Structure formats: C-alpha cells, structure tokens
C-alpha cells in the first residue's frame, strides 16, 4: 500500500493534476511540506492521548505527508526500507539512548 501511494505521489510530481492536494504541496515547496509534516506529527501525539480511530487517521495523514517529503527530496522509499533493515535485530539498551530531557 505505501509503495503504491508513494508511486502515485511521484506521478503527481511529474504529471500534475489540477486541484490535487499533492500538487498544491509540491507547488508550495519544501517549507510548506515541512510545516505539514510538523503539524501532522503534533496531531499524532495529541490523538494518541485520545481516541484510537483518531490516532489511526492522524498516523495516516503523517505517513502521507512523509511520503510527499521523500518525493520532494527525491529519496526512494527503498532507501527507508534499507535503513530499517540495517537496524533490524540490533541490540539497543536504554543507556545507549539520550534521555528525552537531554535532547
């Protein structure tokens, strides 16, 4: 599903469709896309404290906007899959991670 959506987003970038929200984001540029990613990430956090259906909807919105960001930056989805595969099975402990207050 994510691959299909990503391919559709890339298609919109090369073959714009009038009235397309995806094309609106591409036309507005990177700053607008980044703003939307930030907004959607915040909405995910808020939704997680509320209703599961709301959380599902907001995670879906965030995933879409992240895919738009990847397409804008010409980063193939396979690059994310490769990075996640590199991390698979690696042992990580809490002491290897910075405390949230230290960020």
Swiss-Prot record:
The UniProt record lists the keyword Cell membrane: no
Pfam entry (one): PRA-PH
Main subcellular localisation: cytoplasm
Subcellular locations according to the entry: Cytoplasm
InterPro entries found in the cross-reference section: HisE (IPR008179), PRib-ATP_PPHydrolase-like (IPR021130)
One GO location term (cellular component): cytoplasm
Keywords: Amino-acid biosynthesis, ATP-binding, Cytoplasm, Histidine biosynthesis, Hydrolase, Nucleotide-binding
Superkingdom of origin: Bacteria
Pathway of action: Amino-acid biosynthesis; L-histidine biosynthesis; L-histidine from 5-phospho-alpha-D-ribose 1-diphosphate: step 2/9
GO MF annotation terms: ATP binding; phosphoribosyl-ATP diphosphatase activity
Documented EC number(s): 3.6.1.31
Gene3D superfamilies (UniProt xref): MazG-like (1.10.287.1080)
Catalysed conversion reaction: 1-(5-phospho-beta-D-ribosyl)-ATP + H2O = 1-(5-phospho-beta-D-ribosyl)-5'-AMP + diphosphate + H(+)
Biological process (GO), any one: L-histidine biosynthetic process
Similarity comment: Belongs to the PRA-PH family.
Name assigned to this protein: Phosphoribosyl-ATP pyrophosphatase
Gene: hisE
């Amino acid at each position: 599903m994510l691959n299909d959506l990503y391919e559709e987003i890339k298609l919109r970038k090369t073959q714009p469709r009038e009235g397309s929200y995806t094309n609106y984001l591409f036309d507005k540029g990177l700053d607008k896309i980044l703003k939307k990613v930030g907004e959607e990430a915040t909405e995910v956090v808020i939704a997680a404290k509320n209703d599961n259906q709301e959380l599902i909807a907001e995670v879906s919105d965030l995933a879409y906007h992240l895919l738009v960001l990847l397409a804008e930056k010409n980063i193939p989805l396979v690059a994310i899959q490769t990075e996640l595969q590199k991390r698979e099975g690696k042992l990580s402990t809490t002491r290897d991670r910075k405390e949230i207050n230290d960020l």
